[in-house]
Amino acid sequence: MNQAIHFPDREIWDENQQTVCFPVLVHGMQLTCAITGETLLRRFGGSDPLSVFCENRWDLEEEASDLIRDQQEDDQGWVWLS
């Protein structure tokens, strides 16, 4: 893992957006990463998106790291996994 990119264990389920959101620190600056519950369940199966996220955390954090290195933030500074 790149030491300049750190993922604290503070993921949440955002009911309004139907999304798992998880913070990331990039050189000390906080960004938000997100993946929809629908995408999580389609990719990994299961029935509870937050549990599925936790079970697949390492792969999802690696994917988010790649997007961050490629500067794939949206206009709001969020990094969306698909």
Q: Where are the predicted features?
A:
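Short, charged/polar N-terminal "headpieces" of proteins
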Residues: M1-P23
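Acidic, low-complexity intrinsically disordered segments
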Residues: N2-H6, G46-S82
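Solvent-exposed, flexible loop/coil residues
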Residues: D9-E11, Q17, I35, F44, ...
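A short, structured beta-strand/loop element
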Residues: N16-F44
